[in-house]
Amino acid sequence: MEPQPKTIEEHRDYLYGIVRLKLFFLHGFLNKHPEEKFADALRNRVDIYRKTSANRGLLNPTEFFYDVEPWVSMECKAGELFELYKNDVAAFENAAFEVFKPSIDERLEKDFADKSGLAGYQCGSIRHEYENRHDPDTIHFHIANAVCPHSIFDDPNHLRDCLLQLCDHVEKDLGATKVACGTWLNQNPKWLHYFPQEWRDHMSAPNTDVHWHYGYWGQFISARGTSVPLFVRSFLQNPLPFQQDRRIIFPDE
């Protein structure tokens, strides 16, 4: 059956589900890392902020309004609930979700209509970062889904063409000889199928330091942009290494 674009009702369910999942994770993370402040974890480990009306921008805003309403009150109340329910993850998740829910609902239509997630993707489902390079010889790239509601793996030529376009652009136009990407997909055989042995040979150490971005959280979102089943909660209690930064080196001519 041909996959259909998600409806606004499905998008609302996705937002509810992913925010609940992030609250579930946050509870366990903070209990394991009591040295980290609740506000820091809420802002940096998960991306609930971007899904609320506190976010005045698009999917990836350039400005953050953490110090004004409505975020101040929501963050403060959620922190109080964590202290109250530090030993009861379900109670915290349910109560904290109700704190954010009205603000999620307020932003729902704007969030559903936002198509900016693919802005700047020069190579279909792949974009490179040229400006923020630490190593001038290496270009890091990011992955999205330009063929939603299909999976990027449905057409075997799609990712191949995206990656070939990336490599051609990086080598000929940007003058670099390496590309790198840190992503949960580096543990997916379907993804690794597109890469030569050099990609595996230049693997760096796995990284389990969870942050808000889709390099981690993307694995919990379906090709249609909906939530994946709730069994992932067991995964989040004992997360495996999700990100492996692997590099491919262009051979000398």
Regions found by a protein language model. Name each.
Residues 1-154, 169-178, 186-253:
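Non-catalytic substrate-recognition and accessory regions of acyl/acetyltransferase enzymes
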